[in-house]
Amino acid sequence: MTISIRGARVIDPASDLDQVGDLHIEAGKIVAIGAAPAGFSAQKTLDGAGLVAAPGLVDLSVALREPGYGRKGNVESETRAAAAGGTTSLCCPPYTRPVLDTPAVAELILDRAREAGNAKVYPIGALTRGFGGEQLSELVALRDTGCVAFTNGLHGFASNRILRRALEYAATFDLTVIFTSQDTDLAEGGLAHEGPTASFLGLAGIPETAETVALARNLLLVEQSGVRAHFSQLTSARGIELVAQAQARGLPVTCDVALYQLILTDEALVGFSSLYHVQPPLRTRADREALREAVKNGVVQAIASHHQPHEADAKNAPFAATEPGISGAELLLPLAMTLVQDGLLDLPTLLARLSHGPAQALRLPAGRLAVGQAADLVLFDPQGSTLAGESWYSKGQNSPFVGHCLPGRVRYTLVDGHLTHEG
């Protein structure tokens, strides 16, 4: 299908393009920005007046819950939710049953994603078999199947020697390793950031050092091995400082933060709502401000939803017995727009952290709005609003933002020139 988008504000952070004009799509690719090519005839025209046309969002962590956790979500439901949030490309972590540590599991997810057709899905493989921290997964075979990176998540390693060997092996094949840096011993049994709020509520604390001790070790091993590394879900000011120092030394490291960490603090836990139970935990206002500044200055390249949908029973229990995680993919763009509304970021910078930045971090063919590129884009109304929860595609409704009126509204999401969401 040929499509013309007329009179939109076209923003491509990768090329610093920011202009009002037209955009033309043919055979799934962008064929012109501005005047239509000779002989071009649009079969469908979208009125872009007052709207922003931007690269489709690239979300680095959307738990699809398939295979194994159908009560929480599946590939179709969660990719549809992501499309509603403006996402066209997403990475799914290996938190499945069985764990995504074999090509067969990766192939299953990719087949289901192609059938759904809502977004481009890039699997992340488990670094060790079953997250056991002892034996490496079939990393090269997983890469050849389509895995773009590897992680052990919040699971530890049997020894630092095994971790070192894993990183050296990954470096040999130019594989990217994703770290969620949290020391398992220091964090064991913890439910909230160690501080006044946790003490007041009587919740076991997770100290900042659970992040920084693991992060310091991981950075040293990255430097020794030369592996490409991405640090996911940073939560603390000190953690940001360590990554910034590593980047200044020229280490091949990137990082992301969860969007909700830029909005919330541990003070949200007062009231014991399990909707705020996340791992790694929400931290202090000072930490939140440091994360925001790092997003602004580019130390943090990517903002991700870290979407973890749950069934109702997983959250309907005493706080300590609930499962951590927030269902966030569906609200990625409107919730992120609060950062623009509050004057923390300008719109091009926000879009860079939601598209080009994450794509670069994991070397994905996404995050660009340019002639010859795939027509993966989002068209949204920056002056509109979204009532969170008025429509909901994810199986998990575990979001503390449901019922909130958020700035911005996704009007169209397109993947390879095909409409995957219209709102």
Curated annotation (Swiss-Prot):
Pfam families per UniProt: Amidohydro_1
Transmembrane region(s): none
Xref: CDD domains: DHOase_IIa
Sorted UniProt keywords: Pyrimidine biosynthesis
GO cellular component, one term: cytoplasm
MF GO annotations: allantoinase activity; dihydroorotase activity; metal ion binding
Keyword check for Magnesium: no
Gene Ontology terms: biological process: purine nucleobase catabolic process; pyrimidine nucleotide biosynthetic process
Record NCBIfam families: PRK07627.1, PRK09357.1-3, pyrC_multi
Family named by the database record: Belongs to the metallo-dependent hydrolases superfamily. DHOase family. PyrC' subfamily.
Subunit record text: Heterododecamer of 6 active PyrB subunits and 6 non-catalytic PyrC' subunits.
UniProt function note: Non-functional DHOase.
UniProt protein name: Dihydroorotase-like protein
Gene that encodes it: pyrC'
